[in-house]
Amino acid sequence: MLKTLKQMSIPFSGNEYEIENLSKLDDKMLAAMKVSLPNQTALYDAIKGDLNKDGIEDVVVVAQETFNEKFMPFSDGCDESTKDDKWCQIVNKNRRGVVVLLSNGDKYEAAVTKRDIFESPNEDGGAYFPPELAVEIKNSELKFFYSYGKYGYWEYVFALYGKDFKLVRYFSSDNNGPMLEYIVQMDFINHRLDKSANLLYQGNEEYKRYEECIEKYRSFDDAQEEDDYDAIFIRKTYELKTQKILLSEVKKVDYIDGRWLDDLQNSKQLGKILKIDFWSEYLGDNEDELVRCVAGKI
């Protein structure tokens, strides 16, 4: 099939795993994809799965444009003296796009085409590597997953909505190494937003608000090292007023401009608090005392 890509003058990139995925595209898929993207586009990855529940595999193609002006050094601050440095190699920084091809009888049709919804895979992560994107089809849902190593991960989940795709769930986990700080879950079907804050993480607002209770809890066992405490979360459930977010209308799903959905946490789209509760994987007697103390101060 890679031979077919070359015969159709369709460039491709990606690593060995992604190129193997591209090799599984058939002629019908390639023909539908080619009319949806400009000529200056290389295929980057392909994911198969049944999105419209007709029993036939659909395909999501990740592509990357190849405009010359976006070929530049990997890092900023490179010059003639550093051109041979591995961080100054010329890479493709064109943004990546996605084409969702749905089966329709004996052919495929592009349901949604977004030419630049993702950042390039060659962004400079500074002192840490940049988040890594994975696209997945599971249970007829389209998922965009970002892994950021010790800093956490986040995921957007879309489902077919007419001829478009609607955001149905969002999940993010903010970590500081092994310590969880925040977990955010958005349910756009039931219009709920859950935000869990780790009461034992000193950097967040909930710790500062209930510091007296937390320090009392920690004094129960002076022999236990501070870093050994399990996470204990206070979870606040809000009404989420947002009606629908369509994939065709989303401009960017990446990390360069921040996790754009996190803005909903501090916007007018949030309604009243519906519930406050606590959870932990290992909630023991001392943790119960902490929960009672915090609950008494809410």
Model-assigned labels for residue ranges:
Residues 41-46:
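Primarily EF-hand calcium-binding motifs
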Residues 51-64, 136-146:
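Acidic/hydrophobic-patterned starts of short beta strands in beta-sheet-rich repeat architectures
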Residues 2-4, 8-11, 68-115, 158-161:
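Beta-propeller blade repeat segments, especially FG-GAP/WD-type strand-to-loop junctions
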Residues 1-39, 106-129, 246, 262, ...:
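Blade-edge motifs of beta-propeller repeat domains
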Residues 39-40, 53, 91-92, 149:
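A short catalytic or substrate-binding loop motif that flags glycine-/basic-rich loops and adjacent residues
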Residues 62, 111-113, 170:
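Residue-level detector of high-confidence beta-strand sites
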Residues 48, 65-68:
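Short beta-turn/strand-loop junction motif enriched in small, turn-promoting residues
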